[in-house]
Amino acid sequence: MKGLDDSIGRFLDGLDQAGRKRVLRPVDPLPAGRVRVGGRELVNFSSNDYLGLSRHPEVVERSRRWLNEYGAGSGASRLVTGHLAAMEALEAKIARCKQTEAALILASGWQCNASVLPALLDKALWGAEPLVFADKLIHASLHAGLELSGARRYRYRHDDLDHLESLLKAHADKEGPRFIVTETVFSMDGDVTDMAALAALASRWDAFLYVDEAHATGVLGANGFGLSPGMGAELAMGTFSKGLGSFGAYVACSARLRHYLINRASGLIYATGLPPAVLGAIDAALDLVPRLEGERTRLQMMGRRLRDGLRAAGLDTGPSASQIVPLILGDEGRTLAVAKALEDRGILGIAIRPPTVPPGTSRIRFALSAVHSDADLDRLLAAILDAVEATP
């Protein structure tokens, strides 16, 4: 194609000039929350492996066992021959964990949100165009699903349930079903939704409640299975790639809704089923998570300790209340410089900049893990204070 390289080159040059050109850096995972980058060992405070399950011996062993028993791949989409009997049993286990009638496994969190939401919001299903009320800071995959759906969308101020209710009131005369879309733990700020208040509001307005539990799964709630169980959310999705240490996503919902999604969600219909090794890792993680209450408690204590230390130094950690603690620096250049200074001190903390976060809120997002030691946390806090002081 004529002009392709020139067009792409101009685009990449523009990103470079704006300081926003992303590159991929090879990383070698190591035990105990470490990684090797560019030949150097760093303490990794940017991974979502919150419980360290990606290297847990039971997870690795069951993954290996299912690989040996069922082979390297599922071989087809689930509606053909890729729906393994082991996957059917695994979905029943997920449903029990989430206290729902049924569950459905999909290939990734992005694929889940980007295909389930358009299926749910199909005007042909409801006989009228749905109205969606979404938190302003929901994940890009949720925005993508809503955009693909074409439904009417209204954004409420982040975590502001009063504003949400005012929007529901303002549009009460409009025809069509109501949907509320949000997250229980927000990935960039680390704040936690008041699930009880949100569920009560959804019930008052007869709204379908869709919650993304990607960063709560494994970490929060009774037995570590998130904040949605028992709260009446019509659909809770989550991932296996963070607190559960492997890969993939799930939807927990009613049996009838599961059957509908099997017939309408493109991310399931047209995608090859997850490989057996991944399913085995998920199965083991689900067995382990209820036994890790001590690790979850310690993880939250570590989050409080890091927030307290940073706030005592006058640094901005936003509304964080979880294992995700942002250091909000605002300026993109300074954020990159502090991240580099941390790396020089043996700490991996990735700079998060627009468009991932709003302009003026660039930050380093620290993700804590149960495998980090108290000494690791001491080292992190000291390195942050030193790096910030050295990078005015």
UniProtKB/Swiss-Prot annotation:
It comes from the Bacteria. Pathway: Cofactor biosynthesis; biotin biosynthesis. Pyridoxal 5'-phosphate binds at residues 109-110, 187, 212-215, 239-242. Homodimer. The keyword rRNA-binding does not apply. This is Putative 8-amino-7-oxononanoate synthase. GO terms for biological process: biotin biosynthetic process. The gene is bioF. Belongs to the class-II pyridoxal-phosphate-dependent aminotransferase family. BioF subfamily.
